[in-house]
Each structure stands twice: as structure tokens, then as C-alpha cells.
Design a protein with these regions (language model features):
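Soluble "head" domains of membrane/secretory-pathway proteins
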Residues: 1-253
Length: 253
């Protein structure tokens, strides 16, 4: 495990730590602030139980049924990244099956998987091109995404669109004290060990140990944030990483 890597330098070499200010930067939206409880229900973010309006440029990935091709000019005008547009080749059976999910798909001539904003959907509909559409995530079997999401071990039944379980997820704040048990350890262990420096901390035999000693509570030393990208279905963000500590926030675009 980690201790062997640290102690067996002949096999694994010296451990090189990567300073915070030399890590790759990501541009994400801080959707949850320190001390807030976040939950996602059918793509809508709830903060402390209240829904948050979608940003104007938020995108979701759709399967879109069109009555004509998406030309390079249309893609450029809509400001869609061309590499994000996937042309779907469907046989007659696949098309009939998709028509059960997308009204109008039976009469469509072209099918695409692509990210769209609400404004893009309106423009394509008003232009008479868009016959119908459906969010790609709704076609995935339940549990498909959960094993990849944070926190590992608690999110198996969650998805990108429905995240946080029944009670949501509490974002740590400086000075906030939590009760330590299995679930809270799974949620906050990365913050405690990796960001706040308590590397000799673990869960064993039903108890949490901080710095090698049994502990019932933990008080955070830093503020944390929950970050999400506006391309909601294709964003690597806090739904995968977990909380972002204050010293990892380097600025605003």
C-alpha cells in the first residue's frame, strides 16, 4: 500500500510532490460554497434545499433527430465544438427503437449526439431542423455512472443528473466540525488526508483514526468548494474529484 511505496525507496524511488501552484488549471463554476449542502435532482442543482437557475450557457448532451445535415456553417454559427458532434449511423431497427423515445425521430433523416444549450435547441427548432431530442444520460441503465463518482463507496446509485442521495452532500467550511463514522469518512477522507495533511488517518474496525488516534469528530482547517463545468455531461469536476480546497482556487477567468 501507500506505506510500502513511501518506505521502499529501492523499488519505488523518491516520492516527488507536485506543488499546488504547478498543477494544471481547470476553469469551473463554483456551484457550492463552504458550509452549503448540495444536491442535484434531474439536472437542477439545489443549494440548502433551494433550486438554482441554470446558467445561460449550460449544456447537456443530447441525441438529436434532424431533418437535414448539420453543416460546418451551422455548427460554427451555433458555436458548437466540432469535435463534440458525433454523427450516428442507424439502421431501420435502431431508428424505430429511437422513435419510441424521441417523437418525430421516425421522419428524421440525420441523427447526432452533441452538446446543446437551451438557446441552441430553440434556434434549431425555429429553423425547422430539429425533429426531436432526448438527453443521452436518460438512456443509460441505472447505476451506470455511480461507480465513477465521488465519494467512492457512497455514490453507486447516483448519477451526473441525480447526485447527492436523499440528504445531499455537505461542503466543508473552515471551523466546521463533523461527526466521524463510515459514511463521513468516505466523504471527507480526501480532504482530511490529502489537503489538511493528516496522512496517518484511516477507518478500521468501525472507527476513524486521525493521526493514528481514535477520533469521534473532526474540525476542518480550510474552506472548500464544489465545482462544476457548464458542459454538464462532459465535465470532469467535483462530481468526480470531490471538494476543492481554498488553496487550489487560483483565480477567476
Amino acid at each position: 500500500g501507500r506505506e510500502r511505496v513511501k518506505n521502499d525507496k529501492n523499488t519505488f524511488g523518491e516520492i516527488i510532490y507536485r506543488p499546488v501552484d504547478r498543477r494544471q488549471n481547470f476553469v469551473k463554476r463554483a456551484v457550492g460554497l463552504p458550509g452549503e449542502t448540495l444536491k442535484i435532482v434531474n439536472d437542477t442543482i439545489y443549494i440548502d434545499g433551494k433550486p438554482v437557475a441554470f446558467p445561460e450557457n449550460v449544456q447537456f448532451n443530447y441525441i438529436a433527430a434532424m431533418n437535414g445535415p448539420l453543416t460546418d456553417d451551422i455548427i460554427k454559427r451555433l458555436e458548437i465544438t466540432a469535435s463534440d458532434v458525433e454523427t450516428m449511423s442507424l439502421n431501420e431497427f435502431d431508428r424505430a427503437n429511437l422513435a419510441t423515445w424521441i417523437p418525430g425521430a421516425k421522419d428524421a433523416t440525420h441523427f447526432y449526439a452533441l452538446p446543446l444549450t437551451a438557446k441552441m435547441i430553440t434556434e434549431l427548432t425555429d429553423a425547422g431542423m430539429l425533429k426531436g431530442y432526448i438527453k443521452t444520460n436518460t438512456l443509460l441503465p441505472p447505476g451506470t455512472q455511480g461507480s465513477y463518482l465521488f465519494p467512492d463507496g457512497l455514490a453507486d446509485s447516483w448519477s451526473l443528473s441525480n447526485y447527492g442521495g436523499d440528504n445531499g452532500i455537505l461542503i466543508p467550511a473552515k471551523g466546521m466540525t463533523i461527526k466521524l463514522d463510515r459514511d463521513s469518512w468516505l466523504t471527507y477522507q480526501r480532504a482530511i488526508r490529502n489537503y489538511e495533511g493528516h496522512t496517518d488517518s484511516y477507518f478500521k474496525d468501525g472507527h476513524v483514526y486521525i493521526d493514528g488516534k481514535p477520533a469521534d469528530t473532526y474540525t476542518f482547517a480550510m474552506d472548500y468548494y464544489f465545482m462544476m463545468g457548464d458542459n454538464r455531461d462532459f465535465s470532469q469536476d467535483s462530481r468526480f474529484w470531490g471538494f476543492v480546497p481554498e488553496d487550489h482556487v487560483v483565480g477567476t477567468p
